[in-house]
Amino acid sequence: MEGGVVHRRTVADLLEDARSRLERLGPRAALDAQVAGALVVDTRCAELRRATGVIPGSKHVPLSVLFWRADPSSGHSDPELIDFDRHIVLVCADGYSSSLAAATLRDLGFGRATDLDGGFTAWAAAGLPIEPAPA
């Protein structure tokens, strides 16, 4: 808000801005990053994960709590998430909310946060490994 005037932006504007700051990974590159030590974080809801499966070795952190889990000052942080130098690859269903979330993690100081272009849908379409969601 500048001078009391609200400048309206669309979600598409926010998404474009977020993605301009990310080096998004395709499915194969995301797998390679995971093998090299990147933390793959699945932000999808538990119901969707149960219905479609998960990326082996991924960590489930619902989008609704992701930023609190990643902020060491929040009182609700997850030790596995608060390494500001670690390569973090966020995964949502189709690669939209994960882009916005990755940009927010970058704003919090996670310089290597990015997302999976096309989300879990692209991972599955590429024929990469999927396993049942943990109970």
What is the predicted role of each segment?
Residues 1-39, 46-87, 94-135:
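Rhodanese-like catalytic fold shared by cysteine-dependent sulfurtransferases
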